[in-house]
């Protein structure tokens, strides 16, 4: 249920912000949390106003760390427009966020906030309850341009510099229970594990290496605990009920947000090019290889390639082929084991499409992707010639 309120040249009294003045702002009520806190959307920002005392742990550069005096937390889409870069209101990111907090009617000293390039209308909100305990996740996210794997090569070093790459997964996690600061920190670990689990279950690839993504390069998280609650917990790990609720809630919300923002979901991932993107295999790379065999119009080729890319047999065998390569790169299988299994898979794919198989010369990313690409091209070429 939404609460649309048009505000024009009038003073507006909000929870904890009685002296705030807004002009021309539209407020939409998104959700009321079990804590009594309320989430609103103000155009390109989502603000959660606290009804009482809260413990907050934030990874944000702006007023991050552990605090017990905050009145609200927020998430802001900094893009000027769709597909455009984020607008900077000051020379530093911290000052930019301070100015932004004032613009949306907050007291900068009493809030923490996160910036993103994700659209606020694509927010996903999930909540789970066990007995008296409720956990709520408010998530925006997109990793198509900035998804990476921890340990990937990086180009950002200066402590005061703000990376300009976009595509963050921002999480506001609200725990309707009191807890010591250490447990709040443990909840952050569990929350991060859940985010990574969601991404890996979608087999989203890194944009900076051949690995599976574990997040984006600029993910941020805010954890909120209810200091006023009679419930008091000292555990938020995977063996605790709170940890279970955090895991399930965050995983579901992250998947929903990625689907809304980027179209990243099981349906779109049912395509070999989506799975092979991290290995630099694309329709364009296949087209360049195909041109050496047949003179066919590119639109006709692309239609045939996309159709083949989504066929169950091609996707299933290719998925196994990719996982062999992953396990080789992780040191779990040696070259002989991978060579033997990969050649069998290439032969099986060829047999399914009545095409001559391709020999695999060595086990490496380049060699395995070359062999697969040549086989894929041969299948398309043979199909065209048969028809």
Residue spans for each PLM region:
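Position-driven detector of the extreme protein N-terminus
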Residues: 2-5
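Alpha/propeptide regions of enzymes that mature by internal proteolysis
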Residues: 7-387
């Amino acid at each position: 249920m939404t609460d649309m309120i048009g505000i024009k040249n009038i003073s507006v009294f909000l929870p904890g912000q009685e002296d705030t003045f807004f002009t021309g702002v539209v407020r939409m009520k998104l959700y009321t949390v079990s804590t009594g806190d309320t989430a609103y959307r103000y155009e390109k920002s989502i603000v959660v106003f606290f009804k009482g005392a809260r413990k907050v742990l934030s990874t944000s550069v702006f007023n991050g760390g552990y605090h017990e005096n905050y009145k609200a937390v927020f998430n802001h889409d900094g893009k000027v427009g769709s597909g455009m870069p984020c607008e900077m209101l000051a020379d530093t990111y911290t000052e930019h966020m301070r100015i932004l907090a004032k613009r949306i009617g907050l007291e900068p000293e009493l809030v923490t906030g996160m910036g993103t390039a994700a659209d606020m209308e694509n927010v996903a909100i999930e909540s789970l309850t066990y007995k008296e305990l409720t956990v709520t996740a408010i998530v925006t996210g997109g990793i198509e341009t900035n998804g990476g794997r921890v340990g990937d090569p990086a180009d950002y070093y200066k402590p005061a510099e703000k990376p300009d790459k976009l595509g963050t997964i921002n999480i506001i996690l609200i725990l309707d229970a009191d807890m010591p600061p250490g447990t709040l920190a443990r909840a952050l670990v569990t929350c991060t594990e859940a985010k990574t689990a969601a991404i890996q279950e979608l087999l989203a690839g890194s944009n900076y290496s051949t690995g599976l993504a574990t997040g984006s390069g600029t993910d941020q998280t805010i954890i909120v605990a209810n200091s006023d609650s009679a419930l008091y917990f000292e555990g938020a790990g995977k063996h605790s009920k709170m940890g279970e609720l955090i895991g399930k809630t965050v995983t579901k919300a992250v998947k929903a947000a990625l689907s809304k923002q980027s179209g990243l979901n099981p349906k779109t991932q049912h395509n070999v090019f989506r799975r092979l993107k991290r290995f630099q295999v694309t329709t364009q790379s296949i087209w360049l290889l195909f041109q050496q065999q047949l003179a066919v119009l590119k639109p006709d080729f692309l239609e045939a390639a996309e159709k083949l890319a989504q066929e169950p047999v091609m996707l299933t065998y290719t998925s196994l082929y990719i996982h062999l390569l992953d396990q080789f790169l992780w040191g779990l299988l040696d070259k002989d084991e991978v060579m033997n299994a990969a050649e069998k898979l290439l032969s099986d794919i060829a047999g399914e499409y009545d095409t001559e198989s391709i020999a695999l010369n060595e086990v490496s990313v380049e060699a395995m992707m070359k062999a697969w690409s040549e086989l894929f091209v041969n299948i398309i070429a043979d199909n065209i010639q048969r028809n």
